[in-house]
Amino acid sequence: MKKLLFTLLFFPFAGNLNAQNAVESENGIYARFTTNKGIIVCQLEYQKTPMTVGNFVGLAEGDFKVGDKSFSKPFFDGLIFHRVIADFMIQGGDPQGTGMGDPGYKFYDEIDPTLKHIGPGILSMANSGPNTNGSQFFITHKATPWLDGKHTVFGHVISGQDVVNAIAQNDTMRKVEIIRVGREAIKWNAQAAFDQVYLAKKAQDELEQAELLKIAAMSQDDYKVFMYNEVKKNYPNAQQSATGLVYVILDNGKSNEVKEGKKVSLHYTGTLRRGGKKFDSSKDRNAPLEFEYKVQRMIPGFEEGITYIKEGGKIMLFIPYYNAYGKQGRPGSIPAYADLVFEIELLQVTDAAPHNEHDGHQH
């Protein structure tokens, strides 16, 4: 009797090992796609992208809930690869099979900088823009670095890349199985992993939306006072100009001043004041920004701010949204009502090369 009980307790684990066919030998969580062209096995990055893997695993196993949407049967079984582009990728996961379908909800991007579209076999989320993930995913035929930072990588092929390459449009995912190897992977709960990240992001999103409504209701004069007080909490020595620009001079510099028509060379790093997300940096490119002041125009707060230092100087600028990209922001990079923070090092200010009478007429 004891022997029978031992067998019953451990039989599911043994069956799991048989299903792996000796491919999934390392501890981890795997997705096994059985298609009409063969089998593809992907290792899932459940530790680096727990929300995204939680979504995928929950749908695949048919035991998942987001808001008022519940799933009680495997979601992907029987779906087609509705979009296949040669020498690029195969895409599936759409219940409609048209590229327009989703599971009835959308969730946030979960970009991990160590996970990139570095070669064939990268498993990544398809989307229609920032934070519009659902159930559609793709697997690459080759490196696609232009997708980095825009699509969430959450796994990679460990077996069956030849099958990926053989898949044609309308081929079928007959079955998608989730395989867990190791104690940690077996204990890992897809719903809990998803909820932990998703609900925190959702709560933060709701707070930000409430703050945006508050900001939208303020007059420009009221907002100047509000933003100045917010910045001074961390930078008590900050100053504010008549336009509402808040700045902290770190080094005044010693020589040439910024004037209209001068050639300016500077390094900058730009972040969002709310949340602190970096959106651009000349230092990341190892290439200073060079332009002719007030000839090649910048946002008003930037143009004003660099006049407060001289060549060799350093300054932090806190630019209110109305002197940056306004109420609408800049879709894809700058949110609505976004105040911008720039850390600037003014490298050089020189006379610009003389212009001829035809300059500026080619555009």
Residue ranges of predicted features:
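Bacterial Sec-dependent N-terminal signal peptides
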Residues: 1-25
